[in-house]
């Protein structure tokens, strides 16, 4: 069994019982995920059992990245990048602490986050 309850088929199960599957690996540490139940909103797992993992999810129409989550060496989310507008910031990120989003905090992307977003947006081009 691999990261976040993943099995050989690439499935993951979060603590809230959302099921995910790996659609594509951009590199050995960056995975594009989809929820198996397409009726649900687009989300990413709260934890990863693979240290330093990066997960991304595309919009339902597949035209752009919606979310990117970066996890620490303990599998807890460090931050989540959103490409939707939030308080005039588009894109932006929300920091996480101890496995939970920091309440009401939103920031413009830092340079390393911008590079990561570009890498994921351009992976198939």
Model-derived features: positions:
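Catalytic toxin/effector domains delivered as secreted proteins or via bacterial secretion systems
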Residues: 2-125
